[in-house]
């Protein structure tokens, strides 16, 4: 069974805030308040996702995070404790590969959002650069988000959690998930022993490998963080021409096949 890593949250938000868990994304630690100025929190239709600010006006997330009444929060660390840098935006435009529904668990799970107003850089808001080179198998990668910190029950943290995982050969994921095609625009990442993973509510957030923004949280095993069940991440590098074309105003640009 696989899990799209988005999470219905509003009905459980109050309970989650009240809980104090020593469980560590899953298997990680509380992110340092200064290490994620590019990380955004996306709410829509009673669900939550993550996302990545790539310049003052654009956010990159997963296509399956699309929905109505979307709100995007930037400069956030604690959900409960506001800071002077926190900003709220809504989408001005959304862009997808072909259409908002033309994606699969292994292809085109990517959405580019133009904010209704640009944000200014500050101590807690700053974009993350797009990758300058392709990802390399064996890289140590950082995941982060406000998703559930328990693989078996929904427990949302007040602050984002961070963990290090490894970029694995795509064939590792093909062996686990037989529905995957021979090739795709998807990265395979995780810890084969289990215990560390992105999970529900982390969808759309970044996979940062050797300091470069290489992936977007997409889907994985259910429950999360199980041995030999790594996660799948949309390959950002493979979509660079599409991303840059859209930002430059070329709406005719197409995603890679």
Curated annotation (Swiss-Prot):
Function of the molecule: Snake venom serine protease that may act in the hemostasis system of the prey.
Signal peptide bounds: 1-18
E.C. number: 3.4.21.-
GO BP term (any one): proteolysis
Tissues expressing the protein: Expressed by the venom gland.
Protein name, UniProt field: Snake venom serine protease serpentokallikrein-2
Stored Pfam families: Trypsin
InterPro entries in alphabetical order: Peptidase_S1_PA (IPR009003), Peptidase_S1_PA_chymotrypsin (IPR043504), Peptidase_S1A (IPR001314), Trypsin_dom (IPR001254), TRYPSIN_HIS (IPR018114), TRYPSIN_SER (IPR033116)
Compartments, record wording: Secreted
Disulphide connectivity of cysteines: 31-162, 49-65, 97-255, 141-209, 173-188, 199-224
A single GO cellular-component term on record: secretory granule
Subunit structure: Monomer.
Residue ranges the record assigns to the propeptide: 19-24
Family that this chain belongs to: Belongs to the peptidase S1 family. Snake venom subfamily.
UniProt domain Peptidase S1: residue ranges: 25-248
GO molecular function, one term: toxin activity
Residues carrying sugar: 102
Active-site residues (renumbered): 64, 109, 203
Transmembrane segments: none
């Amino acid at each position: 069974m696989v899990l799209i890593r988005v999470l219905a949250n509003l009905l459980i938000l109050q309970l989650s805030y009240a809980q104090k868990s020593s469980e560590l994304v899953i298997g990680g630690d509380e992110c340092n308040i200064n290490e994620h100025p590019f990380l955004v929190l996306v709410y829509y239709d009673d669900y939550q996702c993550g996302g990545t600010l790539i310049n003052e006006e654009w956010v990159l997330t997963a296509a399956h995070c699309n929905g109505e009444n979307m709100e995007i929060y930037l400069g956030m660390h604690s959900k409960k404790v506001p800071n002077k840098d926190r900003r709220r935006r809504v989408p001005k435009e959304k862009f997808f590969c072909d259409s908002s529904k033309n994606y699969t668990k292994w292809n085109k799970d990517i959405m580019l959002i133009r904010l209704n107003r640009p944000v200014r850089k500050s101590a807690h808001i700053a974009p993350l650069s797009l990758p300058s080179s392709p990802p390399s198998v064996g890289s140590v990668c950082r995941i982060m988000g406000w998703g559930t910190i328990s693989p078996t029950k929904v427990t949302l943290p007040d602050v984002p959690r961070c963990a290090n995982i490894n970029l694995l050969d795509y064939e590792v994921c093909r062996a686990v998930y037989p529905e995957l095609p021979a090739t795709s625009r998807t990265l395979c990442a995780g810890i084969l022993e289990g215990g560390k993973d992105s999970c529900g509510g982390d969808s759309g957030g970044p996979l940062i490998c050797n300091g470069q923004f290489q992936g977007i949280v997409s889907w994985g095993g259910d429950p999360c963080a199980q041995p030999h069940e790594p996660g799948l991440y949309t390959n950002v590098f493979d979509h660079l021409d599409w991303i840059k074309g859209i930002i430059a105003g070329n709406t005719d640009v197409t995603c890679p096949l």
